[in-house]
Amino acid sequence: MTQENEIKRPIQDLEHEPIKPLDNSEKGSKVSQALETVTTTAEKVQRQPVIAHLIRATERFNDRLGNQFGAAITYFSFLSMIPILMVSFAAGGFVLASHPMLLQDIFDKILQNISDPTLAATLKNTINTAVQQRTTVGLVGLAVALYSGINWMGNLREAIRAQSRDVWERSPQDQEKFWVKYLRDFISLIGLLIALIVTLSITSVAGSAQQMIISALHLNSIEWLKPTWRLIGLAISIFANYLLFFWIFWRLPRHRPRKKALIRGTFLAAIGFEVIKIVMTYTLPSLMKSPSGAAFGSVLGLMAFFYFFARLTLFCAAWIATAEYKDDPRMPGKTQP
């Protein structure tokens, strides 16, 4: 080997330190420390009263089949719309029977706007049937509506009680006689209808009064007041929702909930219900623009409304039932008396 080809190795000290081999134990310790930090932070967050309460309510809602009960309530709610439509059909028949000129105007509009003679004749026959059989349809619709309404109320009551009682299984005290159960559900249905009428009346009267005040004081042209009026209308609607849910959570559970939990849970339900109404208000018009939406949009929208209403009601019932207080014997570290 010649001198030129001989490998020359450096004899001076290197200016940098050689790369050390990666220590797997050090890497594992860093990962474990990061995981421990994340776990500790998550535990601290879960120990916060609001988050802990939300977790308890969610666990109870899921463990006690909240989604399944919500789907069942949706089904019975949609099924109960059929007798209501029958009653509405009969009411329209009574109105048309007492106003022959209005009936003739409807026939004229049908002939003007529908070019197909067969379809026009079918619609005229349907309207004539509604007028002629209004009494029969109305009585049958009322009877079926009463029966389905009582059963709907019973299903809603059982679903809320499943979320409200301390244990999942029904106790012997929960068993009621057949006629007592139906009488109780009938009274509850009447109470719910009264509460619904009161809340709708409050919303309607408040909205009309607001419009009268705006028109009387000539406030329409003041732009900065428009958001204020919207907020006032929103507050009135939430208050009406609050009255409705307060009656539901106060009347339907077997045992009366604590006042603080009832007030807060009802407020949560009122806000959630208002959010559902706002979302449905903006979603349905866009859904109805498509051909399929025009055909099925109203049905799907109604089912979605019932489903979200049922889930919200049951979740807030679970939220009220899982509320803990310092003097509550169910809290950790305390024993039942």
Curated annotation (Swiss-Prot):
Periplasmic domain ranges by topology: 98-133, 209-227, 285-298
Q: Which Pfam families match?
A: Virul_fac_BrkB (PF03631)
Name the domain of life this protein comes from: Bacteria
User: Does the keyword Membrane feature in the UniProt annotation?
Assistant: yes
Q: Which residues lie on this side of the membrane: Cytoplasmic?
A: 1-74, 157-185, 251-261, 322-337
Q: What is its main location?
A: membrane
Q: Tell me what topology the record assigns in the membrane.
A: Multi-pass membrane protein
Q: Where is the signal peptide?
A: none
Tell me the compartments it is located in.
Cell inner membrane
Ranges for region Disordered: 1-31
- Name its GO BP terms in alphabetical order: lipopolysaccharide transport
Arranged from A to Z, the UniProt key words for this protein are:
Cell inner membrane, Cell membrane, Membrane, Transmembrane, Transmembrane helix
InterPro entries named in the record: IM_pro_YhjD, Virul_fac_BrkB
Transmembrane region positions?
75-97, 134-156, 186-208, 228-250, 262-284, 299-321
Where is the sequence biased in composition, kind Basic and acidic residues?
1-29
Any Gene Ontology CC annotation: plasma membrane
Question: What name does this protein carry?
Answer: Inner membrane protein YhjD
Organism ancestry: Bacteria, Pseudomonadati, Pseudomonadota, Gammaproteobacteria, Enterobacterales
Q: Which gene encodes it?
A: yhjD
